[in-house]
């Protein structure tokens, strides 16, 4: 049967990545000056913004002949990139090996395994150059595995390049009226790619990154020096870093806002119960950053603010959506 694309029928899973919806927020931002819109990346087929990166990098490797049937994809991930790569590997017939932080939710680990990925759980609270860190474990596996590629999203220029299109979508969806974009930063690929596109269209667009307490990213942006004193354990997954990723272009980011583990978790739960949006931990962090910025008087009546919600809440059932976990962290009574 010939597929008639005019009927909105797709022939590949990968066609369901990108062109995610933009939704205006009402209840969670009530009382704040300006208008607020969520870029819902959970509408990608793999339910996160990382689908875009995985597709872009895999297709690039295929074009260059680096990936062939039977090849292996190796990556370091807090969960979402790993899931997206495992999904595409299942589709394409590649072996997929993911080194994942033990801070990642058990849900993410099980989802990776469900797609056939081999998972290596690594301690989160070790230095990046420690042989047990997920960076070093992934590198070692890649070096020991013939016919493999190491995606290396923290230092791969294709990561931000993949999100140039995300910036284009945001610009077109707001008809060029956007004044601020708020994005959580881990590898920095999402925020950097979006920022490049938006600033090319209008240099006055303010790009606001969201960082975690326990991460060195905000301080580095301000001083251009890595301060190890900034680094200590924290709970939020997929945000902040204990190293400085070259995938982050600090020159196109105007400001970073830090949020606490507790505030981000509570805000994600509030988002579900007010807007009906069941989003991930970093989505709570992003909307918490918006509130802090608004309370500091930095938005006005003319502000058109886009907040990127990176993934779906189903990946955090055993964490922020578990009352037991929240109580153990001291986040709720």
Swiss-Prot record:
Cofactor: pyridoxal 5'-phosphate
Record: residues binding pyridoxal 5'-phosphate: 80, 186-190, 282
The keyword Transferase is annotated on this UniProt entry: yes
A GO biological-process term: alpha-amino acid metabolic process
Protein name in UniProt: Cysteate synthase
Keyword Mitochondrion annotated: no
Documented EC number(s): 2.5.1.76
Catalyzed reactions per annotation: O-phospho-L-serine + sulfite + H(+) = L-cysteate + phosphate
Activity dependence on pH, as recorded: Optimum pH is 9.5.
Disulphide bridges: none
Modified residues (N6-(pyridoxal phosphate)lysine): 50
Family: Belongs to the cysteine synthase/cystathionine beta-synthase family.
Free-text function comment from the UniProt entry: Transferase involved in the biosynthesis of capnine, a sulfonolipid present in the outer membrane of gliding Bacteroidetes and essential for gliding motility. Catalyzes the formation of cysteate from O-phospho-L-serine and sulfite.
Functional pathway: Lipid metabolism
InterPro entries: Cys_Synth/Cystath_Beta-Synth, TrpB-like_PALP, TrpB-like_PALP_sf
């Amino acid at each position: 049967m010939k597929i008639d694309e005019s009927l909105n029928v797709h022939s590949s899973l990968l066609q369901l990545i990108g062109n995610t919806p933009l939704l205006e927020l009402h209840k969670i931002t009530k009382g704040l000056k300006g208008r607020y819109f969520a870029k819902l990346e959970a509408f990608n087929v793999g339910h996160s913004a990382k689908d875009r990166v995985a597709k872009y990098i895999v297709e690039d490797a295929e074009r260059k002949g680096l990936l062939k049937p039977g090849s292996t994809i190796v990556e370091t991930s807090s969960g979402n990139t790993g899931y997206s790569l495992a999904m595409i590997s299942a589709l394409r017939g590649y072996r997929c090996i993911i080194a994942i932080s033990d801070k990642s939710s058990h849900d993410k680990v099980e989802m990776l395994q469900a797609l056939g990925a081999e998972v290596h759980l690594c301690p989160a609270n070790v230095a990046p150059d420690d042989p047990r860190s997920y960076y070093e474990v992934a590198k070692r596996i890649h070096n020991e595995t013939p016919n493999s590629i190491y995606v290396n999203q923290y230092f791969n220029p294709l990561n931000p390049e993949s999100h140039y299109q995300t910036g284009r979508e945001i610009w077109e969806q707001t008809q060029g009226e956007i004044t601020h974009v708020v994005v959580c930063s881990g590898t920095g690929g999402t925020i950097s790619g979006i920022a490049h596109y938006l600033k090319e269209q209008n240099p006055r667009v303010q790009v606001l990154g969201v960082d975690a307490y326990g991460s060195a990213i905000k301080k580095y942006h301000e001083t251009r020096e890595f301060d190890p004193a900034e680094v200590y354990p924290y709970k939020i997954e997929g945000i902040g870093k204990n190293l400085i990723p070259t995938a982050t272009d600090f020159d196109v980011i105007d400001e970073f806002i830090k949020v606490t583990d507790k505030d981000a978790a509570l805000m994600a739960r509030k988002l579900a119960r007010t807007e009906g949006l069941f989003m991930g931990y970093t989505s709570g962090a992003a909307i918490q950053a918006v509130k802090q910025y608004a309370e500091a008087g930095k938005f006005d009546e003319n502000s058109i603010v886009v907040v990127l919600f990176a993934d779906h809440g189903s990946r955090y059932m055993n964490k922020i959506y578990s009352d037991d976990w929240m109580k153990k962290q001291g986040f709720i009574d």
